[in-house]
């Protein structure tokens, strides 16, 4: 049984390009982001991979990435489940602010703490711990059972929601996951054993 799980962060969004805190705001992909998503699909197809089900967030940039990946793989119309449990970390009052402007307004050290600490949230927003607490129940209840049934599964989501999955799959500490950067449009492949432990993990690169 092939217990395949592939994670891919959405391609570059319009707000990534503008260096804005995005969170639950809903910009679309840039042309580069579209290219990144298509490249991810082409890389997965070149590996001879296929999927039985895809999961994505409620946000356009992730859904569009998922659609483009599947198109490149010849899987248009694949069963795709969108849920806000997989949304990006909510940056609250920082959402829509340029990151340099936020540093000027709140101070560089404070913004660094909000971005890079595990359990401190910006005003009105989520910490990474909050994001993990939102994402993991959905993973355990919905996505993981799919994988363990042998359904080859794609998850197209966001840097921080995917960090939550990487954290549990790779058994990383909060400190370890904070150091982990996930590139846009770069697939990560996992194969799981019957006990849900990772038997294979690799980055799929050009």
UniProtKB/Swiss-Prot annotation:
Q: What is one Gene Ontology biological process annotated in the Swiss-Prot or TrEMBL record? A: gluconeogenesis
Keyword Isomerase, does the record have it? yes
Site residues by UniProt (Transition state stabilizer)? 158
Pathway per its UniProt entry is: Carbohydrate degradation; glycolysis; pyruvate from D-glyceraldehyde 3-phosphate: step 3/5
Q: Where does substrate bind?
A: 9-16, 22-23, 61, 88-91, 99, 115-116, 159-160
Provide the catalytic activity annotation.
Answer: (2R)-2-phosphoglycerate = (2R)-3-phosphoglycerate
Documented EC number(s): 5.4.2.11
**Mind listing the GO molecular function terms for this protein?**
phosphoglycerate mutase activity
Question: In terms of domain of life, where is this protein from?
Answer: Bacteria
Active-site residues annotated for this sequence: 10 (tele-phosphohistidine intermediate), 88 (proton donor/acceptor)
Isomerase as a keyword of this entry, yes or no, is: yes
What single Pfam family name could you report for this chain, choosing any that match? His_Phos_1
| The protein's role, per its UniProt record | Catalyzes the interconversion of 2-phosphoglycerate and 3-phosphoglycerate.
Instruction: Summarize the subunit comment.
Output: Homodimer.
What is the protein name for this chain?
2,3-bisphosphoglycerate-dependent phosphoglycerate mutase
């Amino acid at each position: 049984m092939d217990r395949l799980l592939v994670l891919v962060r959405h391609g570059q969004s319009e707000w990534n390009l503008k260096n804005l805190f995005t969170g639950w705001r809903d910009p679309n992909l840039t042309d580069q982001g579209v290219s990144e998503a298509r490249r991810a699909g082409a890389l997965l197809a070149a590996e001879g991979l296929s999927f039985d089900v895809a999961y994505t967030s409620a946000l356009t940039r992730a859904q569009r990435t998922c659609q483009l990946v599947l198109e490149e793989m010849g899987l248009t119309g694949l069963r795709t489940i969108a849920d806000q449990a997989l949304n990006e970390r909510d940056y609250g009052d920082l959402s829509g602010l340029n990151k340099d402007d936020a540093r000027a307004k709140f101070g560089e050290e404070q913004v660094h703490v909000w971005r890079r600490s595990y359990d401190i949230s910006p005003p009105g927003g989520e910490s990474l711990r909050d994001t993990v607490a939102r994402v993991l129940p959905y993973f355990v209840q919905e996505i993981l059972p799919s994988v363990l049934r042998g359904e080859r599964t794609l998850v197209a989501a966001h840097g921080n929601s995917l960090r939550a999955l990487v954290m549990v799959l790779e058994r990383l500490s909060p400190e370890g996951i904070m150091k982990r950067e996930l590139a846009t449009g770069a697939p990560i492949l996992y194969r799981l054993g019957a006990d849900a432990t990772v038997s294979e993990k690799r980055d799929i690169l050009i």
